[in-house]
UniProtKB/Swiss-Prot annotation:
Name assigned to this protein: Metacaspase-2
Taxonomic source organism: Plasmodium falciparum (isolate 3D7)
Subcellular location: Cytoplasm
Any GO BP: proteolysis
Gene from which the chain derives: MCA2
Organismal lineage: Eukaryota, Sar, Alveolata, Apicomplexa, Aconoidasida
Biased composition (Low complexity): 576-614
Record-level Gene Ontology MF annotations: cysteine-type endopeptidase activity; peptidase activity
Main localization category: cytoplasm
Enzyme class, UniProt record, top EC level: hydrolase
Regions of compositional bias (Basic and acidic residues) in chain numbering: 51-60, 69-78
Domain of life, per lineage: Eukaryota
């Protein structure tokens, strides 16, 4: 659990304060605070008074002092443990986590030993006595290093001389020369002295100035740490040989190994006692309080150079410029040996700021500038001595083992700690002998007191700036305040002005700081790195030192650097070689010879090891960060690189300043720009609000973070925050290390990797060619450009990088680099992840005043993308820029790098691009990540070749290479659409709200190209909502929906192409006269190639020209028409070649049958191609409209074609469009000709216009009002011409217009090129689709066809009036009733009746083929049938229809039948039946239903192959009909519950709440669940309630406030009908409400959208609504939230036992809970809770009593069995308290919904609720293992009428289940496996069998359990009671088992438990069944102990008991009997 300030407005102040106190308690062991001094504001910010901070500080000081006293007086350490002091820093409120020490502190050598020695004037005799040494006789050697080395019996003084000669320029072997204390050449100083104008200035708090001897320091600081040290030499002697280095190394090693440790321990203890007694202000004896000074050097010119040695000591060399220079080892006593912090521990860092001074020699000819070198506190891991028993041994592994859960990621912006460095410097200069305020210097650091006091938030909030970004994004107003108060982070020193101010660079807190100064002997380095120290994986970093530009000004510069992952030791050195000596530095393997001119006083010119050259990812000797290079004429200087500047997207470490004095001004300017840029970002990161009385915590919203699929949750996917703005001059820009480089054609493909948890550092490979380009790039413009584009410091730090050492190859480096992050969820090697992050700014005319901001709701914007919503610049948005500049500035220099154009603080707003000139509404959400981040390589393959130039060109022409662009042209828009869009515009302009676009939700596997491009994008393509689906267009131009094809990358669309095609077709028609006839032939190649443009234009040409064909060839065409085989006839006769062996006619009706639909589409395309010529012949038959032939044979052929074409169209085309297009063209081409010509015209239209148009989903809705041969064709772009006007009847004047009913389009299916049609298929066609194998049916169809042919002699065409559709346009499969009509017997029965004819459309009540007067009802509700005929005596009927149409204004008042697929025979209302009785005398033939609900739609889902299940039941119904000859249709088809239940519709209520992005996964969960419901289970009625404007397909969303949720739920439950399947889904937050008055009475609640007003949805409110569910309804509820208890009236629940692979039933006891409230575990990182912490609310209404649903007593004794509702409730188990969101495959998902969805995908079609629950639970187990989850378990609750294993999931099977007999508990039964639905219905519904069941005797097993004897007491607790439970399980059956306390609890007596009880088990099948006997331990929760499994055939005996690990622990003795 991370110690984060999880404060939220959703919490109460009390909860927030408790969280704060808990976190502080966790961070600081001794933290205590008073609640009275802490408060919380309304936004969740914690306010702590300063007095409280001061009090805590004083308390902690006292505690630290007392702990030190205890440490000193610990007797147990007196002899065995050395007196290393434990250095604990002051844990104040200021420092908190930044300086909180790890408990694992390694005790270091006391650094105060020098003073102790000096005070007592230790001589050599004392040392000899103490160390038992006999060979140190020379008194003069007491201060010599050799004397201490002689402790190890080293008699050879030459060893020491050799060691000293390394630094001795004069090669002086005289040891006595080292002892000259006057020159202070061998005195080591605690802290560096700065000699300014001959005056001493000390960083000394206590003014202690003691010399330190080299002998003491060598021993105390090096010899006992097993750390070889390196010697620095200011003036290197070229004649140093290898022997000296080797001898010194051997000496050092030997000294350590042979030194007596115990003596040193005793010595150190005496030192501590002395030192502590002399301190006036004794404070923990910390090294931070000790500062020693040194005597002034006699030499005037001293050069002090610091170097970083592995021993954590600074070497200060006092060099005399005279010839007599004594170079000796000078080690500062400053640090001594300190505690060690491991890199993986959290809050362990040191901040010690010291300075040293390097003065310029008087005779320096190069005019070197004075260099001010900062030195840093350093820590190393001390290697334990060989005597492990007597030492305090703590290694890195031990540290990591003790606290493995501590977060290893810790970062902060150290620049906050150095803001007032200049003020401190003034204190030092002006008051050198006065005490420095301890508040200013704390632990060697320099702080601002106010800032420290204000910094009260913990380390996590400070370090993880991403949380600040989120907070700033959500609460941008506070950011404005913070920006006003931000502090300056850097003070740039100018040479002439402000000389007293200091240059402060941001400092990263890292583990080990190595200050290298003047270490030039590579042999030493080599020997050091090859020493055994490299065995420990300790991270090291180097400090880059900066130049001082003025010798008289003391200017400090602080470097910023990273800790690299330790592979092998590495020291990066700063060569500070005097110009006079002409020395060369030989790097280890590089052998880079740099002249002195290139090296003098350039602290940031680093001579790197060869490993840098070996790694392309690390900068080779060239500074790649050329933004910081100040180029001069010295090319060699450019070769110097920053030692810290490894390729890291987050690092802007140092600035290379070369030694030319001319460049110093450039350096100053560059540093200024760095300061300005860094100031912005750092201030944003650690923004503090000062207040006199309170300190404001940065409020962190609960549960906000980002899932990046393998990356840290606190890092963005790619951070291009530091990318500079650079124009793209027709060249591709590559961003390496976030620095823009022009592509010189040598740039390789840049591969980026996920490097660390804290930040995604782009480690890019690069060629040396790039470096060569920049070497020679000395252009002034380039230099200025670089200065102005300094890469800013990234907020996040990286603690997990790799420093590549000497002998590593590039490949090894890459392998080492990818240390798997902790949060790498996907487990994929980051090396394989290609991350491309290109932000494409598309909009060039953004109007910010309208708040048109782009936002995609499918992707809640990750917080790391947002720095500050108010800091957006024009560079980022490209406001008011030219089109050419847009793409040249796609990536700007802004801090933000979001994958969308603009991020506005108004989350609910959506960006809308400006419309094209001809577009009314253009909504485009462009996928900004053209090459999205690839986390799952299998699911997404990127197109890496993105050509920005081409993209730019396409964008200019509005031809976006993006499939989610929808154009709606002005010409095509109808009135309703305009009204809708105007309403949207009003909302946008007045309320700044834009209706969001639909979320693209289907990943269609059939469309490969689409999946390649948009599989795992953050922003799925968006489509418009219902308003833009309802589009009515007559296709004059290419339909707007086909813009998808034109914009598709596969289709190269030229805007002028359509005009060319149009002209091509129009020019073929020479005459434009109305009566002209033309020959027209289609283009075979165009149709063959499926050229969309040509086909659409062909349709247009036909429509525009009202094409008539030449009648000169009429006779020939007539003859050819007789012998032409139409494709539809081939389909009907099944003559065409079909590879499908089953001869199954593939239907394009089914949505779910994807393969069949695509196959049918492709087959149809082939048929169209093969029969193209035949179709052309069919087109020419239109000339027969003027040549009418009365030949009966001709008529038969015509009508044959008519029938077949109708069938063909109904199979392959959209029925709506067929009718409208057919009728439309029919009227256009009809000028009062006879009916046969109309038939021919319909045939041509079917083949040539509608089918082709519908095949390409060119769905166009024409509003048709049909009455007395009247058709009103209303479009905005085409009016009825003169010919059409002639076709209108006189009754047009009496016809009233009805409202336009738009056609809904499935946009998703259009894009995937799937052919979908509406549900109103004819009965005959349903038979073809589903029962093609029935040969008898084909015979019936043929008979029916011949009878229809006879009706062609009729003379008039009666038009059909369309009924208002009440159902969805989505296609569902055939219903239960339609199969009855399709049955062969039923069809034969209907066809044989003379007066009762049912047409091929199921909605036609009847039509008469004979000359009867009163039964002339003609196709009242048919919208698909093309030609219906009546006799001459039909005028009365026609008049009746006119009366109905005139009198009944209500569209529902007319006689019509529902148009949905599954309700085809259960018809509307009794009023319709009465209308039919009064007007048409056909009441006997009206199919009706007794409807309770307002919606008459009924749906059912069956497979194409599942209809056979109902066949036998249909046969039974038919047999009864044969007996009753005179039964009417209504009686025959009225389905009572006894015979076969009514099959209702399926409805879903989906509630989604993401609380402005707090729960990202809810949107994904809802979309995924809707996909399953619609595609798999046939749901077509969705009610969407959400707070994020989520639209699914054409279903419009509503706000998810409390009122809407409760009202919709009430209507959802109450208005349902018997047989309905209801699905209720909720995903969001739940909360526990606790009444302060009644602490024991608590209640759970859901948080709606308006929860801020305390509008909670209480559990009893949901409970009481669901309790109203009655009748034969099935309700499935899924609550994907944490608190789900008592929301649903289901008394029985199931949980899954993974050990048994079975499920366990438990029941609630009157819904009373005795469980204690357990606070859910808050987790951050991989998962996140879906609940809010409990809150206390006053005056909560006491929950109503929960009453379990009880069936009302029914006294009716009829045969109808009352159906009882079945309720199934999926939810997290409240006992395990948690429900989570988690990230998987780069998407955030809810745990429960994801597991259920995956289980649905894995299971077959037939699975029960119990099967689904078991599968989901098993998936959960795998997820829990992967994500290390514990407290998660699912629960399935259900009503006790039926078992979840009885009912199939979301099927109508529950309707056939009858009430079960009450069996004695326990209720055990096997799972009922059905062979087919019909068999199951017969078994359950048969009355005779039911009677037999009542009289039958029960079979049961009596199991007599005697005793259990144990073999072992290993897992047996004799204090607890035990009981035995038994159940029966059949093989291969996943049963529902109920475990009960079937025996009484018994205790163990000796080694046995005696039960002597019977257990009764009810059984149905005795064969192949196993009995499970299990032993449980009785506690608050029963614990499984062991089980025994044996076959049911066994009668008695003893059986072994085995535990979970299958270890036998005892034997159970029992007997079994079977009774009945």
């Amino acid at each position: 659990m991370n110690s984060m300030n999880t404060y939220s407005p959703l919490y109460s102040s009390y909860e927030n304060i408790n969280i704060y106190k808990k976190n502080r308690k966790f961070e600081e062991d001794n933290y205590e605070t008073s609640t009275a001094n802490i408060s919380c504001d309304s936004k969740g910010r914690i306010l702590v008074k300063e007095s409280e901070n001061d009090r805590n500080e004083s308390i902690q000081k006292k505690q630290m002092l007392s702990s030190m006293d205890n440490r000193k007086t610990n007797k147990s350490e007196k002899h065995n443990i050395s007196s290393y002091y434990k250095m604990r820093k002051k844990a104040s409120n200021h420092l908190k986590d930044k300086e909180k020490l790890n408990n694992n502190i390694i005790y270091a050598k006391n650094p105060h030993a020098n003073r102790y020695d000096k005070y007592y004037s230790l001589n050599m005799n004392i040392m000899n006595n103490m160390n038992n040494m006999n060979n140190m006789n020379n008194v003069n050697n007491m201060n010599n290093v050799n004397n201490m080395n002689n402790v190890n019996n080293m008699n050879n003084m030459n060893n020491v001389n050799n060691m000293n000669n390394m630094n001795n320029v004069n090669n002086m072997n005289n040891v006595k020369s080292m002892y000259n204390n006057n020159n202070n050449s061998n005195v080591y100083y605690r802290i560096s002295r700065q000699n300014i104008n001959g005056k001493e200035r000390l960083l000394n708090r206590y003014n202690i100035m003691r010399p330190q001897r080299s002998a003491d320091m060598l021993i105390r600081n090096y010899l006992y740490n097993d750390l070889p040290y390196e010697i620095n030499q200011q003036n290197l002697n070229k004649n140093i040989n290898d022997n000296n280095a080797g001898s010194f190394d051997n000496l050092n090693k030997t000294v350590f190994e042979n030194y007596n440790k115990n003596i040193l321990d005793e010595y150190n203890r005496n030192i501590m006692q002395y030192y502590n007694s002399n301190l006036k202000n004794y404070r923990n004896s910390s090294f931070d309080n000790i500062y020693t000074r040194y005597n002034n050097n006699n030499n005037n010119n001293n050069v002090y150079s610091n170097n970083n040695v592995y021993s954590n000591n600074n070497i200060y060399n006092n060099n005399n410029n005279n010839d007599n220079i004594n170079n000796s080892f000078q080690f500062s006593k400053q640090e001594g040996l300190m505690k060690i912090y491991s890199n993986n521990n959290r809050n362990m860092n040191d901040y010690v700021v010291k300075t040293s001074n390097i003065t310029r020699a008087a005779d320096n000819t190069c005019a070197q500038e004075q260099i001010n070198i900062p030195t840093y506190n350093k820590t190393v891991l001390l290697k334990s001595s060989p005597n492990t028993e007597n030492t305090f041994n703590k290694t890195l592994s031990n540290i990591l083992k003790e606290q493995p859960k501590r977060s290893s990621m810790f970062s902060f912006n150290s620049s906050d700690f150095f803001k007032d460095f200049g003020k401190l410097r003034k204190n030092f200069v002006g008051k050198k002998k006065n005490k420095i305020n301890k508040d200013i210097v704390i632990n060697g650091n320099i702080f601002n007191n106010k800032i420290i006091d204000n910094n009260t938030s913990n380390a996590k909030s400070e370090g993880n700036s991403t949380l600040h970004k989120i907070y700033n994004f959500i609460f941008p107003s506070s950011v404005k305040k913070l920006q006003k108060k931000k502090q300056k982070l850097q003070v740039i020193e100018d040479k002439e002005k402000n000389s007293n101010r200091a240059v402060v660079m941001p400092l990263k807190n890292k583990i080990i700081y190595i200050n290298d100064a003047n270490i030039t002997n590579d042999k030493f380095k080599h020997s050091f790195e090859n020493y055994n120290y490299h065995q420990t994986n300790i991270p090291f970093v180097s400090v880059t030192n900066y130049m001082n530009k003025d010798s008289t000004k003391n200017v400090r510069s602080f470097s910023s650097f990273d800790v690299k992952e330790r592979i092998s030791p590495r020291v990066i050195r700063n060569g500070n070689i005097n110009n006079n000596k002409n020395n060369n530095i030989n790097n280890n393997n590089n052998n880079i010879n740099n002249n002195n001119n290139n090296i003098n006083n350039n602290n940031n010119n680093i001579n790197n090891n060869n490993n840098i050259n070996n790694n392309n990812n690390i900068n080779n000797n060239n500074n790649i960060n050329n933004n910081n290079n100040i180029n001069n004429n010295n090319i060699n200087n450019i070769n110097n690189i920053n030692n810290d500047f490894v390729n890291d997207s987050n690092i802007n470490k140092t600035v290379n300043i070369h030694n030319n004095n001319n460049n110093l001004n450039n350096y100053s300017n560059t540093m200024k720009s760095v300061a300005k840029n860094t100031q912005k970002l750092s201030a944003q990161k650690n923004s503090l609000v000062n207040d006199k009385h309170h300190t404001y915590h940065e409020k962190l919203i609960t549960n906000i973070y980002q899932f990046t699929g393998g990356q840290s949750q606190k890092s963005c996917n790619i951070k291009n925050q530091n990318v500079k703005e650079e124009k793209i001059n027709n060249t591709q820009i590559s961003y390496i290390n976030n620095t823009a480089y022009n592509d010189y054609t040598n740039l390789p493909n840049v591969e980026t990797y996920v490097l660390s948890e804290k930040s995604n550092n782009l480690e890019n490979k690069e060629d040396n060619n790039i470096n060569e380009k920049f070497k020679n790039d000395n252009n002034v413009d380039k230099k200025n450009n670089d200065e102005n584009n300094i890469i800013k410091h990234n907020v996040n730090q990286n603690n997990n990088e790799v420093i590549v050492m000497n002998n590593q190859t590039e490949e090894q480096i890459n392998d080492n680099k990818f240390i798997k992050p902790l949060n790498n969820i996907t487990g994929i090697d980051p090396k394989k992840k290609n991350i491309y992050n290109t932000v494409m700014h598309i909009n060039d005319k953004m109007d910010l005043n309208k708040h048109d901001y782009n936002y995609n709701y499918n992707n809640i914007i990750p917080h790391n993308y947002i720095n500050s919503s108010d800091k957006m610049t024009n560079n980022s948005l490209h406001i008011n820029k030219k089109a050419d500049d847009i793409f040249q500035n796609m990536i700007s220099n802004n801090d933000t790098n979001v994958p969308c154009v603009y991020v506005n603080k108004y989350i609910n707003n959506i960006f809308q691009n400006n419309n094209p000139s001809n577009v009314t509404n253009y909504i485009n959400t462009i996928n900004m990540n053209k090459a999205p981040i690839t986390i799952d390589e299998n699911s997404n393959k990127l197109d890496n070749n993105i050509n920005y130039e081409n993209v730019t060109k396409n964008m200019i022409y509005n031809n976006y290479t993006n499939n989610n662009v929808l154009y709606i042209t002005k010409e095509k828009s109808d009135n309703k659409l305009n009204n809708s869009t105007n309403h949207l515009n009003d909302l946008k302009n007045n309320y700044y709200v834009i209706n969001p676009s639909l979320l693209y939700i289907h990943n269609n596997n059939n469309n490969i190209e689409w999946n390649k491009q948009y599989t795992n994008n953050f922003s799925k393509p968006n489509f418009l909502d219902k308003f833009f689906y309802e589009k009515k267009v007559e296709s004059i131009q290419p339909h707007h929906l086909n813009q998808y094809y034109y914009n598709n990358q596969n289709v190269k669309y030229n805007p002028s192409h359509i005009n060319i095609l149009e002209n091509k077709y129009v020019n073929q028609f020479t005459n434009q006269n109305e009566n002209s006839l033309y020959n027209f032939t289609t283009h075979h190649n165009n149709i063959k190639n499926n050229n969309i443009d040509n086909i659409l234009l062909l349709d247009k040409a036909i429509r525009n020209q009202s094409i008539y064909y030449n009648n000169n060839k009429g006779d020939d065409e007539t003859k050819s028409a007789e012998h032409t085989t139409n494709p539809s006839i081939n389909l009907l006769k099944n003559n065409y070649e079909d590879k499908n062996k089953s001869n199954y006619v593939h239907s394009i009706v089914s949505i779910t049958d994807k393969d069949n639909s695509i196959y049918a589409k492709n087959k149809y395309a082939e048929v169209v191609t093969k029969n193209n010529e035949k179709r052309e012949d069919a087109i020419h038959k239109k000339d027969e409209q003027y040549i009418f032939n009365n030949n009966d044979n001709n008529n038969d052929n015509i009508h044959n074609n008519n029938i077949h074409n109708n069938i063909h169209n109904n199979i392959h085309n959209n029925i709506h469009n067929n009718i409208h297009n057919n009728i439309h063209n029919n009227i256009h081409n009809n000028i009062h000709n006879n009916i046969h010509n109309n038939i021919h015209n319909n045939i041509h239209n079917n083949i040539d216009v509608s089918s082709r148009e519908n095949f390409f989903q060119h769905d166009i809705q024409n509003t048709n009002q049909i009455n007395n041969k009247t058709i009103l064709d209303i479009t905005q772009n085409e009016k009825p011409n003169a010919t059409n006007e002639k076709c209108l009847d006189i009754n047009n004047k009496e016809k009233k217009k009805k409202k336009i009913k738009s056609v809904h389009y499935d946009m998703d299916e259009i894009l995937s090129l799937k052919c979908k049609v509406y549900d109103e298929l004819d009965t005959c066609l349903k038979c073809i689709n589903n029962l093609t194998k029935n040969k008898k049916l084909y015979e019936q169809l043929k008979k029916y066809k011949h009878k229809l042919d006879k009706d062609t002699k009729t003379k008039k065409l009666y038009d059909e009036c369309t009924s208002e559709k009440t159902g969805s346009y989505y296609t569902m499969k055939d219903s239960y009733i339609s199969s009855l009509l399709c049955n062969e017997y039923k069809l034969n029965h209907i066809l044989n009746k003379s007066n009762n004819k049912v047409s091929d459309d199921k909605h036609i009540l009847s039509y008469n083929h004979h000359h009867n007067k009163n039964n002339n009802i003609n196709d009242i509700n048919n919208i698909k049938h093309i030609s219906k005929f009546v006799n001459k005596d039909n005028e009365k009927t026609l008049n009746n229809i006119n009366i109905l149409n005139h009198n009944n204004k209500d569209p529902n008042s007319g006689v019509f039948l529902p148009s949905d697929n599954t309700e085809s025979v259960i018809y509307n209302m009794n009023r319709n039946r009465k209308l039919c009785d009064n007007n048409f005398n056909v009441s006997k033939h009206v199919l009706y239903k007794d409807s309770k609900g307002t919606d008459s739609t009924r749906t059912n889902f069956y497979d194409d192959y599942s209809m056979s299940y109902v066949k036998s039941n249909v046969d039974n119904v038919e047999k009864k009909e044969k007996i009753k000859n005179n039964i009417n249709i209504s009686d025959k088809y009225f389905l009572s519950e006894t015979d076969s239940p009514y099959i209702g519709k399926k409805k879903a209520l989906m509630i989604t709440l993401n609380y402005n992005g707090l729960l990202e996964g809810c949107v994904n969960d809802t979309v995924d669940m809707c996909d399953h419901l619609m595609q798999r289970f046939g749901f077509n009625d969705f009610i969407l309630l959400n707070d994020c404007n989520l639209c699914y397909r054409n279903f419009v969303t509503q706000k998810a406030n409390k009122k809407n949720i409760l009202s919709n739920l009430h209507n959802f439950i109450v208005n349902s009908n018997n047989g309905d399947i209801l699905f209720f889904y909720f995903c969001g937050y739940s909360i526990k409400l606790i009444d302060s008055k009644f602490t024991e009475n608590y209640n759970f609640a859901l948080l709606p959208q308006d929860h801020s007003k305390n509008n909670y949805i209480y559990s009893n409110e949901i409970f009481n609504i669901i309790k109203k569910l009655q009748g034969g309804k099935q309700l499935c509820i899924i609550f994907d939230t944490t608190y789900t208890s008592y929301f649903v009236p289901v008394p029985t629940s199931i949980t899954y036992n993974k050990n048994m692979n079975t499920t366990e039933i438990y029941k609630y006891n009157n819904f009373s809970s005795n469980q204690k409230y357990l606070k859910s575990l808050k987790t951050f990182g991989k998962i996140r809770d879906r609940n809010v912490d409990s809150i206390f609310v006053e005056n909560i209404k006491k929950p109503l009593l929960y009453e379990i649903y009880k069936k009302e007593n029914d006294t009716n004794t009829n045969d109808k069995i009352i159906l009882v509702p079945s309720i199934f409730f999926f939810s997290p188990d409240c006992n395990d308290r948690n429900d989570f969101e988690f990230s998987i495959k780069n998407k955030v998902r809810g745990l429960l919904t994801y597991c259920l969805g995956k289980a649905i995908e894995l299971l077959k079609n037939d699975f029960s609720y119990h099967d689904l629950f078991v599968a989901a639970s098993q998936i959960l187990i795998d997820i829990k293992k992967e994500y290390n989850l514990k407290y998660v378990k699912f629960k399935l609750s259900f009503l006790n009428e039926y078992s979840p294993d009885d009912i199939k999931f979301l099927s109508h099977e529950s309707l056939f289940l009858k009430k079960k007999l009450q069996l004695d508990e326990p209720l055990w039964k096997p799972s009922l496996k059905l062979n087919n639905l019909n068999q199951y219905i017969q078994d359950i519904c048969n009355m005779d069998e039911r009677k037999m069941l009542k009289s039958s005797k029960k079979k049961c097993l009596l199991i007599f359990i005697k005793d259990i004897k144990f073999y072992t007491y290993k897992n047996i607790d004799t204090k607890n009671e035990y009981f035995v439970s038994c159940f029966i399980k059949n093989k291969n059956v996943n049963i529902l088992c109920v475990r009960r306390n079937n025996t009484k609890e018994q205790r163990i007596v000796q080694d046995k438990i005696f039960f002597l009880e019977y257990i009764t088990l009810n059984v149905t099948h005795m064969e192949n069944a196993n009995i499970y006997v299990e032993l449980f331990k009785k506690k608050k929760k029963n614990y499984f102990v062991a089980r025994s499994i044996f076959n049911i055939r066994n009668v008695n005996g003893k059986f072994s008991l085995s535990d979970e690990k299958k270890n036998i622990i005892g034997i159970i003795d029992l007997n079994i009997k079977c009774v009945s």
